[in-house]
């Protein structure tokens, strides 16, 4: 098990002060959030402490997202907004990392837009952060270190300074091999690479010892876990379902297990059966469908069709009747006709999703879809998105209203923002619930009866005295 060796005096040496301060601004998905936790963990071992904000930082990092152009522009806007900090504090080290630098042409764009940056690096060499920060201090030019793939020296174990003490991300694999025609992730995150199950289990058990109650297993395609390490699925090789069973049986203290994100192509009935048997695994499945049209799915290169997707949904409904199913949908993909869009609407009606992330197609340079013709106008895409949202929001509202009067176990996370007498938490199905309570409930699982439903959230009341988690 490869681990990092970190000099605890590095931060002091770089900045000339005993406790240099670091601030990281994170954009994008859970993988980016966890990457930022890892960077905080590495920097803590170098002697850094978290800054209150960017204004009092000695090291400022922007962990960027490239999945849509709007995410890139959001990050760039924030980087430009904080430019004055470099002039008020010339010793401040500013770096840009994450997915955007991995995209062809973006490093040059970043350097052109922000010539005052000290450091640019990507997703594959976070473990080189100590060396990169030292170089950023000593070299006159912007340090650029972007790798095309994850090297063999990438450690299996990385330190992480996690946000909170109840819920934790646990990366089980990196990258994606699917190469959907609209998606930049294989470029930014590389090929699928699984972490050994022994390392994952050890991390989960350590989190349990630290008092964490819930873990989320992370990967761009968790259902492909193990293919690169243990062989093809379906031939007796250790796979994602086996990992779920292993963790479920060997993680005393962990009360809830979640996982994201799934790819329908690799999600087998065997995995659904194993999940159904695992007591700690929550009844929540995020199953990105992207479109309900077979012809659009082919153009997207999603590697499944509508019938196969609905078969997977059927397995879940059969084996886990209370399952909450959510999805991602893209409208306005190149060439999408009204008839194809209607197929997406009919799929949404058929599946009855509990929630959906719905987006207009966003062109990503370097992807095959960017070369496709028959593009829809922005007004057309907006109009279709609005129709889709109306259908999905109606379904979500009705499903939540059906939950009124029912009792759910809620893991309480803390006080609702700005409300000293209201707490919030989540059902096993990943639905947000608020109800009257105080800080003493934090970290407990309590039974809550739902009294009011919104489109996306629920309100409730305590049923009985709270039960402290074991």
Swiss-Prot record:
Indicate which residues the UniProt annotation says bind [4Fe-4S] cluster 2: 176, 180, 183
Q: Cellular location of this protein?
A: Cytoplasm
Q: Which InterPro entries match?
A: Elp3/MiaA/NifB-like_rSAM (IPR006638), Methylthiotransferase (IPR005839), Methylthiotransferase_CS (IPR020612), Methylthiotransferase_N (IPR013848), Methylthiotransferase_N_sf (IPR038135), MiaB_methiolase (IPR006463), rSAM (IPR007197), rSAM_horseshoe (IPR023404)
From the UniProt record, which GO molecular function terms apply?
4 iron, 4 sulfur cluster binding; metal ion binding; N6-isopentenyladenosine methylthiotransferase activity
Catalysed reaction, written as an equation = N(6)-dimethylallyladenosine(37) in tRNA + (sulfur carrier)-SH + AH2 + 2 S-adenosyl-L-methionine = 2-methylsulfanyl-N(6)-dimethylallyladenosine(37) in tRNA + (sulfur carrier)-H + 5'-deoxyadenosine + L-methionine + A + S-adenosyl-L-homocysteine + 2 H(+)
This protein's GO cellular component annotations are: cytosol
Whether Transmembrane helix counts among this entry's keywords is no
Q: What does this protein do?
A: Catalyzes the methylthiolation of N6-(dimethylallyl)adenosine (i(6)A), leading to the formation of 2-methylthio-N6-(dimethylallyl)adenosine (ms(2)i(6)A) at position 37 in tRNAs that read codons beginning with uridine.
Q: Which family does it belong to?
A: Belongs to the methylthiotransferase family. MiaB subfamily.
Q: What is this protein called?
A: tRNA-2-methylthio-N(6)-dimethylallyladenosine synthase
Gene behind the chain: miaB
């Amino acid at each position: 098990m490869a681990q990092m060796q970190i000099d605890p005096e590095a931060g002091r040496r770089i900045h000339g002060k005993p406790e240099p301060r670091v601030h990281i601004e994170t954009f994008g998905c859970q993988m980016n959030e966890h990457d930022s936790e890892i960077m905080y963990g590495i920097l803590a071992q170098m002697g850094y402490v978290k800054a209150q904000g960017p204004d009092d930082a000695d090291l400022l990092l922007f962990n960027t997202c490239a999945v849509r152009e709007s995410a890139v522009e959001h990050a760039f806007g924030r980087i430009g907004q904080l430019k004055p900090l470099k002039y008020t504090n010339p010793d401040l080290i500013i770096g840009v990392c994450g997915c955007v630098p991995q995209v062809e042409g973006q490093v040059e764009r970043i350097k052109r837009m922000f010539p005052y940056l000290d450091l640019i690096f990507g997703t594959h060499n976070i473990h080189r952060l100590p060396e990169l920060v030292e170089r950023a201090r000593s070299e006159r030019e912007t340090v650029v270190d972007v790798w095309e793939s994850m090297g063999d020296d990438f450690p299996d174990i990385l330190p992480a300074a996690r946000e909170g003490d109840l819920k934790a991300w646990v990366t089980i694999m990196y990258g994606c091999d699917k190469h959907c025609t609209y998606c930049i992730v294989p470029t930014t995150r590389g090929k699928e690479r699984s972490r050994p199950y022994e390392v994952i289990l050890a991390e989960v058990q350590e989190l349990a010892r630290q008092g964490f109650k819930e873990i989320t297993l992370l990967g761009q395609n968790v259902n492909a876990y193990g293919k690169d390490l243990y062989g093809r699925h379906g031939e007796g090789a250790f796979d994602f379902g086996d990992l779920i069973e292993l963790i479920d049986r060997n993680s005393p203290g962990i009360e809830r297990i979640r996982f994201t994100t799934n790819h329908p192509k690799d999600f087998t009935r065997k995995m659904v059966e194993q999940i159904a048997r695992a007591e700690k695994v929550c009844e929540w499945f995020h199953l990105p469908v992207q479109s309900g049209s077979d012809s659009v799915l082919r153009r997207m290169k999603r590697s499944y069709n509508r019938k196969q997707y609905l078969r997977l949904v059927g397995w879940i409904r059969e084996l886990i009747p209370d399952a909450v199913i959510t999805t991602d949908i893209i409208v306005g993909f190149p060439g999408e006709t009204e008839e194809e869009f209607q197929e997406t609407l009919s799929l949404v009606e058929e599946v009855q999703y509990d929630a959906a992330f719905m987006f207009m197609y966003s062109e990503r340079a370097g992807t095959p879809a960017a070369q496709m013709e028959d593009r829809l106008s922005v007004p057309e895409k907006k109009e279709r998105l609005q129709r889709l949202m109306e259908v999905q929001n109606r379904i979500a509202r009705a499903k939540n209203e059906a939950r009124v009067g029912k009792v759910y176990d809620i893991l309480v996370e803390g006080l609702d923002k700005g409300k000293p007498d209201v707490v919030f938490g989540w059902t096993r199905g990943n639905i947000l619930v608020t109800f009257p309570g105080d800080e003493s409930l934090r970290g407990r699982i309590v039974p809550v009866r739902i009294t009011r439903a919104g489109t996306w959230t629920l309100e409730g009341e305590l049923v009985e005295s709270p039960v402290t988690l074991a």
